[in-house]
Amino acid sequence: MIPKDKEIVIIGCGIVGLALGRKFIIEGYKNIKLIEKETSVASHQSSRNSGVMHAGLYYEPNSLKAELSREGIVLMKDYCTKNCIEWEECGKIVAAKDKNEINRLENLFARGKRNNLKGLRLLNGKEINFYEPYLDGKAGIYVPEESIVSYFDV
């Protein structure tokens, strides 16, 4: 643990640097410096962020990535709600474009179930079109927990 009287320097004011600075302030650190070479924050990688809050569909069950993804989406939604930042639980569809991809889709669905994703549904082509009329898929997975937020608002 860093003693609270020490100076902390964070290089880069993207979303990670700003989140670290915020965390240190909350933890009671007083002497924090954020250094950014650009004239505004989040000018590089953070500005290319799609804003997706991932539910953890793709990660190996019981892996650190799966665990952090599940924990992270809950924390992120809570943070946004508490700070009046708009976010949307819009869901996501992962589609198989042909019969060859259906087996991989079914394996991905099983992985999502093992990662405790809520409300996962396997879809046929007609069910896909209920959500996305112009998506041509033979089968799909509906992931209702997937959400989006504006990185800039965060």
Predicted regions and their residues:
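Short hydrophobic segments within beta-strands
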Residues: 11, 35, 95-96, 144
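Glycine-rich FAD pyrophosphate-binding loop
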Residues: 25-48
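Beta1/beta-strand and adjacent pyrophosphate-binding region of the FAD-binding site
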Residues: 2-16, 33
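Helical element adjacent to the flavin cofactor pocket in flavoenzyme catalytic cores
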Residues: 141-154
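Dinucleotide-binding Rossmann-like beta1-alpha1 core, especially the glycine-rich loop
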Residues: 51-131, 137
